[in-house]
């Protein structure tokens, strides 16, 4: 495992991080949401993102094999099982999140349709041409070698298979001074970009099925998470440490400021392997 992967795993496996993402960020869904005017409900907005991505897969029949990389608590996988009857495998680095994922599956009677695997998406523990679809939400940014992730996705996808994912990214030519506090918080030298991921796609010979730029939602989401965290601070006393809350608020402020300064981007990308 790379040093960055080790740092990421330790962070998400910490008690504070687990409790924060479970209680504040969105429960089963811990990714950026789609907000409507006047709406600040994180869980509802996060589920809208899942629904928006899932509609792009309506042409795939029940029984389709889907791999979710960086799956978090597995909320997207359970949605796809229930609504699309897909056979889902969730791969994730955090063992704590994976345990919660398995518990959710047990409670909802989905264990036989939803396999949860401890693993790193830079080295997927699956044979070539195993999956019809690969799905990911706001996870690829954590890789120190994003092209390796794309190569692994290409390897495990069947011919004609599709990769659909969202990711927080940086704008081409982004102001380093504004971007740097965001990168330091997540221990990265850079983020991906629409251009970078399109270059990866071209290098692998994939078809572009559509890219949706939803950048304003990034600011909406981080602002909503910050407001929710501030509003529930007393409630979280004894659940999440004060030091973690203070650190998280500072980090969320950096994301909001960078988003407003137009150095960040977020969207949904959808590609097909030939």
List the predicted regions and their residue ranges:
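N-terminal auxiliary segments of SAM/dcSAM-dependent transferases
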Residues: 1-21
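Conserved alpha-helix/loop element of class I SAM-dependent methyltransferases that forms part
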Residues: 27-36, 40-62
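Class I SAM-dependent methyltransferase SAM/SAH-binding core
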Residues: 65-68, 73-123
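A short acidic, Gly/Pro-enriched loop at the edge of an enzyme's catalytic core
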Residues: 122-133
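A short glycine-rich, Lys/Arg-flanked "PGG" loop and its adjoining helix->strand segment in the class I
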Residues: 147-162
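Short, glycine-/aromatic-enriched active-site segment of Class I SAM-dependent methyltransferases
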Residues: 165-189
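Short alpha-helix
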Residues: 189-205
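Conserved Class I S-adenosyl-L-methionine
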Residues: 210-274
């Amino acid at each position: 495992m790379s040093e960055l992967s080790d740092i990421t795993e330790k962070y998400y496996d910490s008690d504070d991080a687990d409790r924060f993402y479970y209680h504040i960020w969105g429960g089963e869904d811990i990714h950026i949401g789609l907000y409507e005017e006047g709406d600040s409900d994180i869980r509802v907005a996060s589920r809208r993102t899942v629904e928006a991505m899932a509609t792009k897969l309506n042409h795939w029949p029940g029984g389709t094999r889907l791999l979710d990389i960086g799956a978090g608590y597995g909320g997207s996988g359970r949605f796809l099982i229930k609504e699309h009857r897909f056979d889902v495998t969730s791969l994730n680095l955090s063992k704590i999140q994976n345990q919660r994922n398995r518990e959710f599956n047990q409670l909802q009677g989905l264990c036989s349709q939803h396999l949860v695997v401890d693993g790193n998406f830079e080295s997927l523990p699956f044979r070539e041409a195993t999956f019809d679809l690969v799905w990911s939400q706001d996870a690829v940014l954590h890789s120190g070698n994003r092209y390796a992730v794309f190569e692994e996705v290409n390897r495990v996808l069947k011919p004609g298979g599709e990769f659909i994912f969202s990711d927080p990214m940086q704008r081409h030519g982004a102001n380093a001074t504004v971007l740097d506090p965001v990168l330091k918080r997540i221990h990265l030298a850079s983020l991906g970009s629409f251009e970078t991921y399109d270059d990866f796609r071209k290098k692998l010979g994939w078809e572009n099925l559509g890219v949706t730029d939803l950048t304003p939602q990034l600011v909406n989401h981080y602002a909503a998470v910050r407001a929710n965290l501030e509003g529930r601070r007393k409630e979280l006393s004894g659940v999440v440490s004060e030091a973690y809350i203070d650190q998280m608020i500072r980090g969320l402020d950096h994301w909001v400021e960078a988003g407003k300064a137009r150095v960040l981007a977020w969207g949904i990308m959808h590609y097909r392997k030939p």
